[in-house]
């Protein structure tokens, strides 16, 4: 008969028939034990003594599965961290094209990984398993379809692969305490976003991978020699000086004028000189565009090269406002850059807006066809009616179901009423030749009703001012 090892709590969910429990033991007894791999040719046996070894990890649970999880070192953050800690081989079995690399298995080599499910099931189910040396019943005990979340490209809706690759990082973990300290000084609306969603993100902050293998973007200003010497360039003047040194040493270089284009491919053409006399070429990466966004408070003034007074007068900024999804975007990058560069907070107040959904509460998407073009309403009801509808629909931090009928209703009830009041006054004032400057009556001489209207106007204006200060724009 077959003998299988799995978590006791999952026996009823996994096993297909009545079984006899031969032995019970803690999972820790398996740690350090070796096992036969399902695809032994994927990683050469001589490459690592730690490959195909049982490890312990606190993220393996008994809520589903078998209590035993396969670790793919190069294809997931938890897997990678565990693999580096245990010294597992960092070996890619999938290329940048999403296909299995040569040597994985004759029937899988060169094939797109997401198109091989049936082939892999067939290989594991065959007598002897994937290489013919396993049990006659095959290596696959059971297969089961189930639903789970999986990342997809937001543009193409194609499935994505987590993929370990060489990158440049900002060591955000080194400034974690400062991030938390500066965040505590921000006046958040609502406060539970700053303490909860954003605060939790900061408490679990990871180092920031800022390099991207793209053509368009801000080039990483780092030059490296073959022996590993590096220079980081901080200005055009510094680049010009380094280019001049390289030219004097005999390295050919293009001109580097004051208005040099600092983007690819121009910037890639400069060869610099290392301190030991070696040629240095630029690291072929551009920066994460979110890094650009985080530099906005000083980049807008071309600081530190110009406008020091204007920068000092406007930093940290008084107020920012964006959707709640920016807790991992702009809210974070602003704070990350300012904490690492200036050792200071980036903004004093932040209003975190709820996301705008369609009338049925679903996320708007071009592929779903439920996008609302705001210009349709601007041209029909006007921008003010659209703005007033959104302001009064509810608390700004709550998700909003955008209903086009609501804009039309706001236009009819609010703005048409205001227009009719104005039109009534304007028509009769013109008919009577009314001149507000010449015929104005002092407030103290006006009727009680007129004075009450003025008092009520100033009271409402004061309340609105106070509520706007507290981001209670819906009250």
For each predicted feature, which ranges?
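Alpha-helical recognition segments enriched in aromatics with Gly/Pro capping
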Residues: 87-98, 214-216, 239-399
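Conserved small/polar residues in nucleotide/adenosyl-binding loops
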Residues: 473-475
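Short secondary-structure junctions
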Residues: 18-24, 37, 137-145, 279-282
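Short beta-strand-centered aromatic/proline hotspots
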Residues: 54
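Residue patterns forming the tRNA-binding/recognition surfaces of aminoacyl-tRNA synthetases
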Residues: 1-4, 9, 29-36, 42-45, ...
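Short, flexible helix-adjacent loops and helix caps
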Residues: 302-303, 398, 430, 434, ...
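Short, amphipathic alpha-helical segments that act as regulatory/interfacial helices
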Residues: 335, 415, 419-422, 426
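Short, glycine/acidic-rich hinge or "gate" loops at secondary-structure transitions
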Residues: 218, 347-350, 426-441
């Amino acid at each position: 008969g077959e003998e299988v090892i799995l978590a006791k709590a999952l026996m009823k969910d996994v096993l297909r028939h009545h079984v006899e429990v031969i032995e019970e033991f803690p999972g820790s007894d398996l740690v350090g034990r070796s096992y036969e791999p399902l695809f032994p040719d994927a990683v050469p046996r001589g490459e690592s003594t730690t490959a195909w070894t049982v490890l312990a990890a606190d993220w393996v649970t008994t809520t589903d599965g078998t209590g035993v999880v396969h670790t793919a070192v190069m294809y997931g953050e938890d897997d990678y961290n565990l693999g580096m800690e245990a010294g597992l081989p960092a070996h890619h079995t999938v290329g940048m094209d999403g296909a299995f690399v040569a040597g994985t298995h004759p029937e899988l080599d060169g094939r797109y990984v997401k198109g091989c499910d049936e082939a892999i099931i067939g290989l594991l189910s065959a007598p002897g398993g994937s290489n013919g040396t396993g049990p006659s019943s095959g290596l696959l005990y059971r297969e089961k379809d189930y639903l789970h979340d999986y990342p997809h490209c937001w543009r193409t809706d194609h499935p994505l692969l987590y993929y370990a690759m060489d990158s440049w990082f900002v060591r955000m973990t080194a400034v974690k305490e400062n991030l938390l300290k500066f965040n505590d000084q921000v006046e958040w609306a609502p406060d539970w976003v700053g303490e909860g969603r954003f605060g939790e993100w900061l408490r679990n902050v990871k180092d920031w991978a800022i390099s991207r293998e793209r053509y368009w973007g801000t080039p990483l200003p780092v030059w490296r020699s073959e022996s590993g010497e590096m220079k980081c360039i901080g200005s055009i003047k510094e680049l010009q000086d380094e280019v001049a040194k390289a030219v004097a040493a005999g390295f050919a270089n293009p001109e580097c004028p004051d208005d040099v284009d600092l983007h690819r491919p121009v910037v890639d053409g400069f060869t610099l000189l290392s301190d030991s006399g070696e040629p240095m070429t630029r690291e072929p990466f551009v920066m994460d565009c979110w890094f650009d966004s985080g530099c906005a408070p000083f980049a807008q003034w071309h600081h530190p090269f110009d406008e020091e007074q204007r920068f000092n007068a406007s930093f940290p900024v008084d107020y920012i406002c964006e959707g709640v999804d920016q807790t991992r975007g702009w809210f974070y990058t602003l704070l990350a850059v300012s904490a690492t560069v200036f050792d200071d907070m980036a903004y004093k107040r932040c209003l975190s807006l709820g996301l705008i959904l369609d009338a049925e509460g679903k996320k708007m998407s071009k592929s779903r066809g439920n996008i609302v073009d705001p210009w349709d309403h601007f041209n029909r009801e006007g921008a003010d009616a659209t703005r007033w509808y959104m302001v009064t629909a509810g608390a700004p931090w709550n998700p909003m179901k955008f209903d086009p009928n609501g804009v039309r209703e706001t236009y009819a009830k609010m703005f048409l009423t205001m227009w009719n009041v104005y039109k009534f006054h304007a028509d009769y004032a013109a008919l009577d030749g009314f001149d507000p400057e010449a015929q104005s009556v002092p407030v103290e001489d006006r009727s009680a009703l007129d004075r009450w209207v003025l008092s009520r106007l100033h009271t409402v204006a004061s309340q609105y001012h106070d509520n706007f200060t507290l981001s209670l724009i819906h009250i």
